[in-house]
Amino acid sequence: MIEGDLIPAGHSLTEQARTHARTYNLRDHGFQVSDGPLFTAQEAALIKQHAQRVLNGVYETGVPPRTNTGGPDASVHPAYIEAQMPQDCDDVIASAIRHPGVARWAAEISGARRLKIWNAMVMQKRPSGGEKTKVGWHQDRRYNDNITRGPTMTVWIALADVPSALGPVRYVPRSHLWNRHFQTGFFDRDIDRQEREFDIPAGEIWQSVEAVLPAGWAVAHGPDVLHGSGENCGDAPRTSLLLSLGIDDFQVLPAHYFASRQNDPRAAPIIYPSGG
């Protein structure tokens, strides 16, 4: 078992992210780091501010998100909080999910002719949350198969610097090629047990790569790659924006909540091509 990729000590966060951007790609490894910021520093700071407002239960449009595990009393927030469909309640976030730089990059790395948002979330992993800030190894397909048909991808954007101490998203390169449907889940935090039990195909190796990111940078992944994250051992929250994208002629299953939002251009815009 190989734990971690070998980046020399002392490399800056930007150098680490650029190394990952050069080394790993969506097709061959199941994930890809942007080769630069998709949001400017000012954009990332503004979106982070509005993400925090939403997570604190402040909804500028008067419309709540679909779910919010935060709320007005931050003292009782759990260690990991998220709000789903925050574009309904905040204009800055509604604009951010349509950002042309994000759309162009996602289309470029995926080869998509068309990209449509079907879900979005703002998320925060709080410091000193211990085990409760871990996210177990999982494949998005385990969840997406109950919602969508056809190709999908996820884009995860850092709204502030995410060094290793904050528990960045981590990936198992090439695991999307193993032809395995693992039943491990997001909230299964016994990561050591998970790793002992995984059935790794002959000729493949286990490698865990942390997608450390400067503010405004992104990492994208497909539905079959194993990913998760460690605990936040740092001194700042890990705050991010997540976009779930449908590629080309994907469909949302008609019985699901998200199907009811697909004709709403604020909730589920076509972000590529622009004006689509």
Regions found by a protein language model. Name each.
Residues 5-6, 162-226, 250, 266, ...:
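Double-stranded beta-helix
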Residues 154-157, 236-251:
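A short hydrophobic beta-strand segment most commonly corresponding to one strand
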